[in-house]
Each structure stands twice: as structure tokens, then as C-alpha cells.
Amino acid sequence: MDSLPKIWLQAWETLSTRAIEGLFNYVEPYKTYRPYLRVWRVAAVSNERGASTKTGGTTTPCTSLVDTKFGTMYDNVSNSAWCGLYDKGYPGQPGKTLNDLWTFVSEALPENATETANNGGCAVVCIMNVPVYKGLVNYYTGTKRTIGFVCASTGTTGSMTGYENVFVHEIGGHAIGHLADCYISS
């Protein structure tokens, strides 16, 4: 979880547990296949709580910078679900990258898990400690990496905007299930 000062470790414990339970206790096929999937939780302590904000565009500077472990950002435009990191740093942004996150997680995993992670056998999820309804998953075919970001939405548990549902949608649907969104407008 990014943007987690040390005093918030209990919040990370609660949010990560809610995410795992939301995926494996209520949603098929994950409920049935739970014994075949391994989950490791890795806490990362940040200097500040929150995430940097920006308005559209990969190279757009942030409108506010927050000093977090992974430098996560989110687009504060209401119709954008973008949140996370880029593959390289840009001026006016926190300067941290997807590779920084991947390296931190890889180094924290048990030895036997690192090979699986580096061969496309896992998805890394970064829970962003900001109360907004946003989530995103990126696939990187060249490196066989799948990295997802889920913000700690304050929507009602069990509702479409509830944190657990956003986690299930992004991680169960996109990161693990490799399903695409299908939106229809009238």
C-alpha cells in the first residue's frame, strides 16, 4: 500500500484483508480456486499520506506532490479512472516508476516466489491510500508484468463504488482474469 505513514499500518492491515476477502470469499471462480492461488502482502511505509494529483496526460506535471514510497498519482478529473505510475518519470511528477514498485515487491517476496513473479506468474497490486473511486491495471508483455492500482474508495461495502468491488473488478477481472471493460453509452 502506498502513502502509508507508520501510524497507519493497522489501516493497511484492514484494507488488504478486506481486498483479499472480497475476492476469495464472494466471487467465483476465485472462491473455488482459492487453494491454487498464493497471496503475499507487503507493507511499505511512506513519509506522507495520500497521493500526488494531476490532470490528464502522461507528461503533465502534478498539481500537488505527496511524498510516498512509490510516488503514486491519480488524475483528479472526475471522468477519469487513471491512477498509478508510469514506466518512466517526468518533470513535475514524483519521479518514481513502475519498475521501482516492482523491484520493491520482488525483493520482499520469498525466494521461490520471485522467479514466478519475474515469469509472468503473478499480479502486483498497489493499494493507494486515498479515498477516491479509481482503479487501473497495466499489462507489460515485454516484461510479463501485471501491475494494478486500487484507491481506497469510501463507497459502501457491497456497492459498485465500494472498495472491495473496485478491487475485485480491477484485480479479479483485469489482472487475473484478463477481461476487458465493455461500456455502452446510449
Residue ranges: model-predicted function:
Residues 1-5, 23-185:
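Active-site-proximal segment of zinc-dependent metalloprotease catalytic domains
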Residues 1-4, 10-18:
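N-terminal module-boundary/linker segments of secreted carbohydrate-active enzymes
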